[in-house]
Amino acid sequence: SLDKLVHSFSFDLNSRFGNNMSNQFLATYTSIKDMRGTNSDIFPFIDIMGGYDAATGVQDMTPYMSLGYELFTYNNGVNNKILTINDNFTYNLGAHKLMAGLSFEYQMANNSYMRNGTGYYRYRSLDDFLTGAEPEAIAFTIGYNGQTNPSAQVRFNQYGLYLQDEWNINKN
């Protein structure tokens, strides 16, 4: 399953000061939580392959059976938070329309992914699995410094200050 929660809010204030001045203040906030989920219990993923021919040394890589927690779902998710604020002041001077403004943007992205987070075991054959033979391949993903749900997080801020002159040369 893919649990996607999106929350978004905005605030817009438009003000007039006489006939030739106005201001717009706009703020928005968005939070996106996109977690991949499953109804499985945490259990290693096991691949049992189609068999191994000891005489020729050839491994049949066709999966005979696979079971366990899906390899790409454990601790797989993205969280984003975005805040934007804009404030624009406009002054009309006949042929010139001046606008001065400030802007601010904050973004945070948090991404987590742990392939093989519950462990992975691959057996050459059903017989190897049933007799307790050593797996042919094993994989574990362990978070840095022992973290159980590691993630990469990126944050940044962007500021802006601007002045614009909209000039109508001809009267229409």
How would you label these PLM feature ranges?
Residues W167:
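Extracellular/periplasmic metallocenter environments
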Residues H96, K171-N172:
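Loop/turn elements at helix/coil->beta-strand transitions in domains of secreted/extracellular proteins
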